[in-house]
Amino acid sequence: MGIPLTWMLLVMMVTSWFTLAEASNSTEARRCSECHNNATCTVDGVVTTCSCQTGFTGDGLVCEDMDECATPWTHNCSNSSCVNTPGSFKCSCQDGFRLTPELSCTDVDECSEQGLSNCHALATCVNTEGDYLCVCPEGFTGDGWYCECSPGSCEPGLDCLPQGPDGKLVCQDPCNTYETLTEYWRSTEYGVGYSCDAGLHGWYRFTGQGGVRMAETCVPVLRCNTAAPMWLNGSHPSSSEGIVSRTACAHWSDQCCRWSTEIQVKACPGGFYIYNLTAPPECNLAYCTDPSSVEGTCEECRVDEDCISDNGRWRCQCKQDSNITDVSQLEYRLECGANDIKMSLRKCQLQSLGFMNVFMYLNDRQCSGFSESDERDWMSIVTPARNGPCGTVLRRNETHATYSNTLYLANAIIIRDIIIRMNFECSYPLDMKVSLKTSLQPMVSALNISLGGTGKFTVRMALFQSPTYTQPHQGPSVMLSTEAFLYVGTMLDGGDLSRFVLLMTNCYATPSSNSTDPVKYFIIQDSCPRTEDTTIQVTENGESSQARFSVQMFRFAGNYDLVYLHCEVYLCDSTSEQCKPTCSGTRFRSGNFIDQTRVLNLGPITRQGVQASVSKAASSNLRLLSIWLLLFPSATLIFMVQ
């Protein structure tokens, strides 16, 4: 059974159509260089074919752009605009719309997206389809791109005033923009004259000797250098009232308010008044000031206080941002000084917690608080940096000494409510000074030295157990073996430490407590160590406020069991003297004269194993030492310096 003729004809027609279509978009070529720039070259054996790329139409040798936007079925832009491009197309939206992933356009809300609207700061942005509007607030004028205020449209305390070179009207605080009237003749005590304030218009502040605020009572005629003096018929406002309206009256012909005009008054945070004045209704009329009013009534206000006016009187009041609701929010200041510890609390914050009459004390109630001021008002309390006073407790480890105490707060001397307790402490790294203060009975020596003039310097000298110089020997005497080392430290306390340094000029040992004993063993002489004794090491001398040396323990030849140490010290002015010794090479040793008024003494030190009692030898020193320990925690030497 053969294929019907009708089907054969149909197949031939379709095949012919595809062949023609293919031939219309591609062409055989001899080489690829014959293909158009927007065509693709394919090589199949010996056949080279040029075919136009997608988005182009032609025979491959010549290809032209196909306009997909010309017919709706060749692009998929729905409610967006189709824009033809070489070989393709794109969908575009009008201004105010945004293209979605589905290639449709949606409205842009310029009012909700930052940076898209240009409305004035006071205007309200209103979104519309494809656009937006700017609307000025009620009482303001303008196109929304710029809004100007009008009288009565500003918030309380502000006024509609011109600003900038173009004089556009904006709401401003008149306390920051006013003119000054300084004429002394405005005083109600000034006599006759014929001044007239016809040219006044705007906000003004009165300053100078004539007074700083308007008179509040009727002023006699022919005063204030004018015929009919003008006065404020009413009281001045308080700071919380903002801008108030008052009547200014002019006294003439036995009528205290013969003429009147309305003015505005405001109490400003800086402790002064400003007045929105208008020209008087007649001439000669002028505004008068009260000479009893004074400037600077708020100069004592601190940074955490506002200057406010109550019934025409200025006073300082804590700012609202000082208010707290919990003790944990208290701002404190802890100062860990060399001799004292001070704890301070902000007074305004205490008042916001209800402490109007603060009663502050420490573990020892005899140590109570006091008021002090700098930029702020504080309630402070001080305790010596020592164990015991004010109930202060000392804790000590190998590296630090820590003093702690408890601060108690009450609202009065008698207590019915819960009192507040605040623990505080200061930690000090152990050095020679701190270690002496934290020792119960360090081996020290004391001597007062005066260098004519004024200025007191204290020098201490102590014997330590190790090269760290943080553990002083305790007690009135020390027993050591000849293998042990003596670590001696001297330190300058107080005075101008940036200028003066401590120099040990002569340090020596004697077998008796007499520093002038002819039997002397010099450890340091003429500021330099004894070179024959290799155990001597000067750690520091003439470089800072402290000086240190060490030497191995020894005994004197003969029937001597005790050793006493003596050091002559000197305060060297580093700004004008060479203080650090130069000890290299052979040096002449004088040591003939030692100023005993500059000598500190330590001892006795006895050799371990000696059974002889040293109590008698130390008794006189112990009695003297016990007296000094009540005054100083270490050996002291006082310098009086000009």
Curated annotation (Swiss-Prot):
Its main location: membrane. Residues 455-590 are annotated as: ZP-C. A lipid is attached at residue 618 (GPI-anchor amidated alanine). The record marks 588-589 as: Cleavage. Residues 28-64, 65-106, 107-148, 293-324 form the EGF-like domain. Coiled coil: none annotated. Residues 431-454 are annotated as: Flexible ZP-N/ZP-C linker. One of its GO terms (cellular component) is endoplasmic reticulum. It comes from the Eukaryota. This is Uromodulin. InterPro entries: EGF-like_Ca-bd_dom (IPR001881), EGF-like_dom (IPR000742), EGF-type_Asp/Asn_hydroxyl_site (IPR000152), EGF_Ca-bd_CS (IPR018097), EGF_dom (IPR024731), Growth_fac_rcpt_cys_sf (IPR009030), NOTCH1_EGF-like (IPR049883), ZP-C (IPR055355). One of its GO terms (molecular function) is calcium ion binding. It is found in: Apical cell membrane; Basolateral cell membrane; Cell projection, Cilium membrane. Disulfide bonds join 32-41, 35-50, 52-63, 69-82, 77-91, 93-105, 111-125, 119-134, 136-147, 149-160, 154-171, 175-268, 196-283, 218-256, 224-288, 249-257, 298-307, 301-316, 318-348, 336-426, 367-390, 507-567, 528-583, 572-579.
